Amino acid sequence: MAVPARHTSKQKKRSRRAHLKLSVPAMHYDATTGEYRLSHRVSPKGYYKGRQVVSENSASDND
């Protein structure tokens, strides 16, 4: 069974984990609906790239 040769210091441990931070999701302003939404996703009102791709009735039926 492997045993560490030396104690891992806090600095070594934290610098190794530095790339594991969370990133802020990319939000974009949708000019059609006037709301912010995640990029490459349909808005809550069913619009994508300025066109309505999902009707609002079918979007609310999934609740």
Swiss-Prot record:
UniProt-recorded Gene Ontology molecular function terms: structural constituent of ribosome
Matches recorded under InterPro entries: Ribosomal_bL32, Ribosomal_bL32_bact, Ribosomal_zn-bd
Top-rank taxon, per record: Bacteria
Keywords, sorted A to Z: Ribonucleoprotein, Ribosomal protein
Alphabetical GO biological process terms: translation
Any Gene Ontology CC annotation: large ribosomal subunit
A Pfam family it matches: Ribosomal_L32p
HAMAP family, per database record: Ribosomal_bL32 (MF_00340)
Protein name (Swiss-Prot/TrEMBL): Large ribosomal subunit protein bL32
Gene name of the encoded protein: rpmF
